[in-house]
Amino acid sequence: MASTPSSGSYDLAIVTPTEDHSLRSFSLSQGNVQQTFLVSTQDGAFLDQQKASFLQSYSKDQSILGLVFEFLQFLLDEACPPAPLGAFLGAIESQCVRDANIHDLIVSEPEAKNIIRTYYRAHAVAGLNPRPAPSGLFSTVNIEAHRILMAFGGQGSTNLVCVDELADLYSLYQPLLEPLIASVAPALASLSREPSTLQHYLGREIDLYSWLTIPESRPDRAFTATAAVSFPIIGLLDMAHYYVLGKLLDSDSPKRLRSALQGLTGHSQGIIVAAAVAQADTWASFLAQAQWAIRLLFWMGYECHTAAPASPLSSAAIRDSIEHGEGSPSWLLSVRGLRSPALDALITDCNRRLPESEHLSIGLINTERNIVVAGSPRSLRGLCLRLREIEADDGQDQSRVPFRQRKPVVHHTFLPVSAPFHSSHLRAAADRVKERFPDASSPQVGDLLTAVYHTRTGQDMREMFSPSNNLIHSLVEAVACETVDWPATLQVSRSKPPSHIVLLSSSRLSDLVSEIVDGRGVRIIAGTVLAPTDPAVLGGKAELLTTKPSQAPTPWAELFKARLVAGPDGRPILETRLSQLLQAPPIITAGMTPTTVHWDFVAAVMQAGYHVELAGGGYFDAAGMTTAIEKLAAHVPPGRGITCNLIYASPHSIAFQIPLIRSMIQRGIPIDGLTIGAGVPSQDVVNEWIQTLGIKHLSLKPGSIAAIYEVIEIAKKHPTFPIILQWTGGRGGGHHSCEDFHEPLLQTYRDIRRCSNLYLVVGSGFGQADQMHPYITGEWSLSFGRPVMPCDGILIGSRMMVAREAHTSPQAKELILAAAGVADSEWEQSFKKPTGGVLTVQSEMGQPIHKLATRGVRLWHEMDKTIFSLPRDKRVAALNARKAEIIRRLSADFAKPWFGYNAAGDAVDLEDMTYTEVIARLIRLVYVSHQHRWIDPSYRQLVLDFTYRTLERVSNADYATDKLDLSQPEQFVEQVQQLCPAATTRRLHPDDVRFFLTICKQRGRKPVNFIPALDEDFEYWFKKDSLWQSEDVDSIIDQDADRVCILQGPVAVQYSRRADQSAREILDEIHHGLANHFEEGPSQSDRPSLAISEMVSARVTVTESNTHRIIRPTSESLPSVEDWQAFLASQVTGSVRSAIMAEEVLRGSQRQANPLRRVLEPRTGQSIQIPLDGRDLRLVEDAKNRPLVHIKPSGDQEVAVDFYYYDFVETPGNLRFTYKFDSKSLSLVENLDGRDDRVKLFYAHLWLGRADLSYHRLSEVFEGEEITLSSDLHRHLHNALRHTVPDATASATTNTLPLEAAIIAAWKPLMEPLFVAELQGDLLRLVHLSNSIRYTPGAAPLEVNDVVATKSQVRAVTIKETGKTISVEAQIFRSKTLVATVTSEFFIKGSFSDYETTFSHQDEAAIELKVQSAIDEALLRDREWFLLDDPTQSLIDKTLVFRLHTVTRWKDQSTFTSLKTTGSIYTKHWNGTEQKVGTVASEVVECHGNPVIDFLQRKGTVVQEKVPLKHPGLIDNGSRTIRLPLDNALYSSVSKDYNPIHTSSVFARFADLPGTITHGMYTAAVSRAVTECLAADGETGRLRSFSASFVGMVLPGDQLTVRIRHEAMCHGRMVLSVAAYREGTDEKVLQGEAEVEQRTSAYLFTGQGSQAQNMGMQLYDSSAVARSVWDEVDRRLLDQYGWSILNVVRANPKQITIHFRGARGRRIRDNYLAMRTETRMPDGSTRLEPILRDLTAKSESYTFFDSRGLLYATQFAQPAILLMEKAAFEDMKANGLIQEGAAFAGHSLGEYGVLASLVDFLPFEMMMSVVFYRGLVMQFTMERDSNGHTGFSMVAVSPKRVGKYFDEAMLRIVVDLIHRQSGKLLEIVNFNVEAEQYVCAGHVRNIYILSGILDLLSRSATGPQLVASLRSASDPAITDVAKEIAVYLEKAPQLNNPTELKRGRATIPLQGIDVPFHSSHLRSGVSVYRRFLEERIQAENVQVDRLVGKFIPNVMGKPFAIDRSYLEEAAAVTGSSVLRELALAA
């Protein structure tokens, strides 16, 4: 199929034809795929015309093949002439179908049927015959290799749709089927109209053509399902399938098909079709045979249907059957779930109650458990009722019922048939049919040309009957009267069973066949199915017609066959799939508590060479399990892995054990496997374990059939991961199910074996080789009539408990040896009574458990029956009723005796014991006196805990409890008696009874070994922790083993007959016994290798020269890795061959898969060069003919491996490894001498360009060279990114370099510390964890041509369980100024112990601590590390800031060798400034924490610079999806990171990577670029920091989605979370953070006039920070001046009266009186007077009033505005929104807001007082009339609104004219927006005049002329404008109230302002106000650096400065003598 690229559109493309003589091209295309055909020029032109019409309506959503055939169908619909149709069809044949068959092509096509239909119809219309199918199955058939049985279907569930299915087949293959239909249709029509049948069909005669072509003509399905119709139709359907198949194979003759068959048969009526087919040698004879077969089928159907015995049922009975899921009663009942003997017994029982005419009989045996019963509907319904009585209910849980006591799970349904076929009921009907086919006119058995297998016996009918026998009569008997034995029919038991069974049946016959033949090596092909759902299980029609050979599956007996191979010592080893996985014989010692809890026992088994499971169920905390695994790991043989067995039903244990195993594997502990018992985890849980733990295999122990299928589903979800299914059934020792051992295996084996990654291990009841052998061979299943079912391994447990190394006590072993055991058929009796010495009881988890039937266990069994079976609320009463008896039995028989005994030896309750009696009894039970040991350390503490309680309760004196001596427990009671004599006589207090019971159950304490009470917890006391005593009988009373619980299986216990064998001896005995059963096969080392010729003919080419053999994989199809490696191994010798074949490499105690096998995997473009003597091997890069890897022998049995790397370096890098082959573990052992140094030298050559290691120490500073950041670097970085992030181009147009340029600049100093000699580690296992790049605050970004120098230092080297982390910090300097800091973290995987090299330098986050009390101060002063510069100063009410640095050195992972914390202590002042007041100096050794930081974090608060957003969100669209480059070479070159894993596939494979991996730095750079695009508008300079952690592997070409979230703010910078995810899986591969600067901002503060009621109150309600500012000021103003600013803002009252009563009132009055202003006297002198002139020392109150509301009075408006601005600013600051370095400006009063927020030169409360004073001065120094009016106001003026002809110069002239002509104030005081807005202050009358004049100039037609004359006049006073002003002055009213001012065209009065701010009128108050400020402002509090360059004063309009020029200019503008003097001094 020709393909051409396209844009991905799904429109049909028209391709211009290309003329070539008489041929031309004609093309169709879909999406990016095009199909081109060669046709004649004439036909091509016609097809082009048709295509033009076709384009209007074709379906776009389909494949190219579907499109081609849709166009072909279009031609048919358009009645295309045969010539062009044939030409196009021929082109399809040659270009699409080619040498295949059309059925081959349509298997996966959704429109398969349409294609088939069109294909064959087109052939018919074009007059062409389809080419014969080149069947691989039938063409090359060999009777020995391919034994094909063909089977036809019969009656069944498809009866209802048989007509529909025939019609469907006819529509597909109508041209092929027409002869067959034509030959039989008349016969059926005639037969159904005969007089004898007419009455039955009655208008529903079989009109075949109508039924096939007109759906509406078909009778209802209930009628067609009857035998009278379905018999002939189903028979015809089967013959039609055969006819089509034969025609497709050979249109001339059916002989080709028939002769290829071993035989034919049919299910039920299908045998008639088989007999007809078997006689046909030509198509003509086939049609003749079809006619008699159809006639026979018709009469059989009709006669049987009409002869069916009447058996009326009531409607209620019918309804009942339907409601029970049995269907409508009929004459055949399918029964599934019962075997034939059981069903026979039921039938016999039913028949006893039935007349013979209604007897039941078995009609068909479909499978062992699928049987069909024939009889009348009434009788069959009776059988159904009987089945309901004995069967389990749907969904009934019988898991706790022993298997043999369960109700059978039976499914029984009526089949839609109308006669009791295969029964004696049809004898008369059969005779009538025979009469219609007399011998003379009927075929004979001898006419059969091929074997036809009889359905009763499975015999060839030619051997079963005489050749002259009437064939039809035999067939009638078989279908009507004789039982069908389908398994026998299928020949599976013959010596040469079929290799293939081809089914031509519309029914689900394949299910029946599959159940019978699975595992026997038979391929089932459903020849009626176009596309089977699972081709691996069931073939379809295409498989019959394809050229590809059809292979029969390998029988289970062969596929899973065990064999012998030679072990390392030459002795034979039994090998199965399991042993290949585990590298051990297939005998597993199961995880058992307590036996395999002990690491030494597990080690003994592993040292013996066998697999064993460490039982995690015996560990209750991580520490104990860690210790055990570490000890075990130290004792396991090299190359062997540990498997841990965990109890899934114990969530507490799983919660700590799974993370523990994960961490230990990460540390390198060789844990290979995990076994999960007591439950099957969910898919999600298993998926997480497989993905994250690092295990190599997982074993699951299902307890039921349902659980087995759960395991199967898990295996399907992880098809490449080994899952071991351990099946033990119910006969196993210890916990067990109630399941039969064999039955679940029989039911699930087929499905288990369909999962190639599932390993089947069986256990329970095993103990010797002879007994195990049938399970290894699979012969165990033969007795069940099933094929051989081999198991992969055997699980043993019980017998291992008597091994010498087992901790089982000798007394317990003796009891095990004495137990007789039982046969498998008897073990279920253990539920009721001791059986073979074993009894089943219910464990503490409520599960059945097998234990030896000791006295103790027999008591347990009795308690289960009589006590624990009761509801919990009834147990105590039952216990009390038998109290004396139970106590006696406990003390006499049980491992846990009754606790309560007094000194006299009488059994008593706990409350009746004295305190010393309790202590004495405790010691008696928990201390083993004759061995001088405590049973468990927690028991010793139990004694002490109760003794402490005793002393607290009974003694009145204080005793030092640490003086209690338990070293001699026997004398301990005497100590207590001496200390507290009363304890001897005083009985336990009720509280202490409860206390004792509580501490007995304390978590973490071993459960007590006695029964303290017969209470509601009796089951806990009795059952908890019951197994350990079998390993410590010495701790039991009288050392009586018959008291204890000993796990054993009832079947397996019989095989324990000796206690003197070691674990090795037991296992070797079994293993060698098994091996003796097998013929010795070839040894492992002598397995035949694949011949060269075979490989060459497959997928390898070999070229030989005189010296070498060059081997290459073919480019078309690479060989499998296994074949390739086996072939390479066959070409080399000695140690090189061992290096290739070894599956694992041992590196010290660590194991890993052999990397050389990965390196040598077949790859196009690489070849293998081997000398003819096979001594070495080179992997060669073909394109450049240079070696990449060289493997050669080196010394005795050693091999050296050289790796070469050529890119980016002048001389190739060379890295050598050496290995030695270990024959015992079959692994390579790596020589580690100097290995890590060689790796370092290799990378030093690549990264640093040198050939030696660093001479530095880790603590030194590493200096880099001074480099220039060139434009080439800028360009290369841009080029590396532009294809991935096309819109990241902004940086390319500027000289600003992206952030990652800093890493490139610092590359060598960052890398050099990795080569320090003292830094141990394998750099091949180095991964880059993270990068962080941060610009120094205020530093400009790096730019092209910057010259920078770099130095680095190692900040930390730390060791974790899985490796070593190295943190390196590099500082980049520009002009000797720090510009950026780069921090890189690296991680070297491995296990390290060189803690002496570890350290960490940590700059701690600043911590603020508020000293609020004397206690706080005392606590601080008490710290030794807290050193004040002045110890006498008080710290109370001060805020301390700690800025510290910690240096840490480690002893081990949790202990510090030393920890040194130093730094400075500062006090934080009210304005944020800090003053050093002390130091911190702390150094501690051998510690686990930082006492300084821990204390400060508890008492103080960590200063957080970043403020999280309340509602984080996505930036812009939030994400960008990008695709990474396919090659990493460009970025390697740019970044200088020449690590070969980025560019060399060889090194990547060696490192076990899925391919060359993309640089983490590149992924970070891409993510940075996306961040800039989305969050910084592409402005590189705005990105101030970027950090990235590399959390996932990224490959070239990966598609990533980068997501940006705005998470926080920091000093005005956006803090962004940056994450990159792999598209498709959403796996996170990068997590980072960026800080993006805002565009340069300015913060503007408004002035008076902006006030409004409730201003700032919304923020007050929502912000705690703003609220605290408001509240604090409100409190101060209320306290100082008696009024609430919150009230003023919220209510805007018109008046406030302040009362001066009491001490507080007098103080407030004094505050007002102290506020003075300067008043000029008539004589020119000045004096200070109170601002509130009518306030005296005797005033009792004062009232502020303003008719507009006091918020509009200056003295209240100004502080309110300032407070609102300050609160808003502090809220923004607290949220991190204030940008560092931003400009600040305030409009008028707003300047106070700037200074209060930016500089804090006054405490804000004082600033508020200053502004209040300022407002009062302005308000009350103005003269006011009786109404309070000053006569002044302000107005905003917009010259632009006057007209284009009016500007600022004209405004100045007009203002000046009004001022001069009126003699009153009018000035421009604010220049806000040039030409847009100005503010004038002046007398109200003048403002009125200004508004009128400007209105005149804007509205008058002469306005422009008036302004022009004013502009040109030498004296404005004589202009027309001046005259107009004079007119206004005369007419203007005597205004004094600003409220009368109206808005003009160019003017807006400022409402509420009656003070002419910023005007000369107020100048007189400047000196007084200056003095007022000077008294309050201290020079040292003015932080000038915060003002310079940031604050923009009103009077200057440019940033503040303190240089001379700025001061001079300011002095000139203001006329300030003070500024003038400062300028002179500057």
UniProtKB/Swiss-Prot annotation:
User: Which reaction is catalysed here?
Assistant: acetyl-CoA + n malonyl-CoA + 2n NADPH + 4n H(+) = a long-chain-acyl-CoA + n CoA + n CO2 + 2n NADP(+); holo-[ACP] + acetyl-CoA = acetyl-[ACP] + CoA; holo-[ACP] + malonyl-CoA = malonyl-[ACP] + CoA; a (3R)-hydroxyacyl-[ACP] = a (2E)-enoyl-[ACP] + H2O
The ranges of region (Acetyltransferase (AT) domain) come to 148-526
Q: Which GO terms describe its molecular function?
A: (3R)-hydroxyacyl-[acyl-carrier-protein] dehydratase activity; [acyl-carrier-protein] S-acetyltransferase activity; [acyl-carrier-protein] S-malonyltransferase activity; enoyl-[acyl-carrier-protein] reductase (NADH) activity; fatty acid synthase activity; fatty acyl-[ACP] hydrolase activity; fatty-acyl-CoA synthase activity
Region entry Enoyl reductase (ER) domain, spans: 579-824
Which InterPro entries does the annotation name? Ac_transferase_dom_sf (IPR001227), Acyl_transferase_dom (IPR014043), Acyl_Trfase/lysoPLipase (IPR016035), Aldolase_TIM (IPR013785), FAS1-like_DH_region (IPR039569), Fas1/AflB-like (IPR016452), Fas1/AflB-like_central (IPR013565), FAS_meander (IPR040883)
Task: Name the EC number(s).
Answer: 2.3.1.86, 3.1.2.14, 4.2.1.59, 1.3.1.9
The pathway noted for it is:
Secondary metabolite biosynthesis
Give the start-end ranges of region Malonyl/palmitoyl transferase (MT/PT) domain.
Answer: 1643-2016
Q: Classify the source by domain of life.
A: Eukaryota
Q: Which key words are in the record?
A: Hydrolase, Lyase, Multifunctional enzyme, NAD, NADP, Oxidoreductase, Transferase
The UniProt annotation puts the region (Dehydratase (DH) domain) at 1130-1604
Q: Where is the active site?
A: S268, S1788
GO cellular component terms, semicolon-separated = fatty acid synthase complex
Q: Provide a GO biological process annotation.
A: fatty acid biosynthetic process
Task: Please state every residue range assigned to the domain named MaoC-like.
Answer: 1512-1625
Q: Does the keyword Coiled coil apply?
A: no
What does the UniProt record say this protein does?
Fatty acid synthase beta subunit; part of the gene cluster that mediates the biosynthesis of oryzines, natural products with an unusual maleidride backbone. The two subunits of the fungal fatty acid synthase oryfasA and oryfasB probably form octenoic acid. This fatty acid is most likely activated by the acyl-CoA ligase oryP to give octenyl-CoA before the citrate synthase-like protein oryE catalyzes condensation with oxaloacetate to form tricarboxylic acid.
Subunit relationships: [Alpha(6)beta(6)] hexamers of two multifunctional subunits (alpha and beta).
Q: Which family does it belong to?
A: Belongs to the fungal fatty acid synthetase subunit beta family.
Return the protein name: Fatty acid synthase subunit beta
